[in-house]
Amino acid sequence: VCTTLVYYFATYSRDQVEEKLRSTARGHARLIDEFLEERASDLRFAAASSSLEKLSNDKQLADLFQRLQSNSDAFFDVGVFNNTGKHLAYVGPYDLAGKDYSKEAWFKAVQKEKIYISDVFLGYRNYPHFIIAVRNEGESGPWYLRATINTMAFNDLVESVRIGRTGEAYLVNREGLFQTKPRSGGRLMEPAPDFESYQKAEKEVS
């Protein structure tokens, strides 16, 4: 009888802990989704309030970037693209203006989806980052506004949830690659070693 009671208590306690973790994860996921939706809305409004002709001017684009940053310091840089994927103007620390993005996965996606939030990728800057891009319709056809989200700021947002003294929060994409850095170790875009275990646990719950 004692063995049965101990086993039942251990199982009951474990189930409680797992449900608490799931509830915390769901709540934090909603917070992250809201953050990304707000930044996409900022970018969409900025594009709708201007034009390709205006934002192709470096000063006009710099003014827009200042307005974006006044809403959120999570914006790291911004660029404007024509309908062929040419990077017409850029505000940020990299030399990206004039480059051709027509074959980039994010550019192909935003042509179809109107708003696109990427996974972490390297791109021309050869550094892990992710972007939000929006499509806008102009007199001469569609054009695109793209902003990079500050990786450290986003990482801090994801890590802001605390689960006990040793728990941690991080994001992985559908392929199981780290999208934020775990405190326990691991680099952006590396495979998460426990990804298959998480998938199995989720299937058992559902």
Question: Where in this protein do the model-derived segments appear?
Answer:
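Short, solvent-exposed secondary-structure junction/capping segments
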Residues: 48-52, 85-86, 176-177
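Short, structured helix-loop boundary elements
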Residues: 14, 18, 22, 40, ...
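Extracytoplasmic/periplasmic ligand-binding sensor regions of membrane-associated signaling proteins
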Residues: 69-160, 165
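Intrinsic low-complexity, intrinsically disordered coil/linker regions enriched in small/polar
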Residues: 91, 152-206
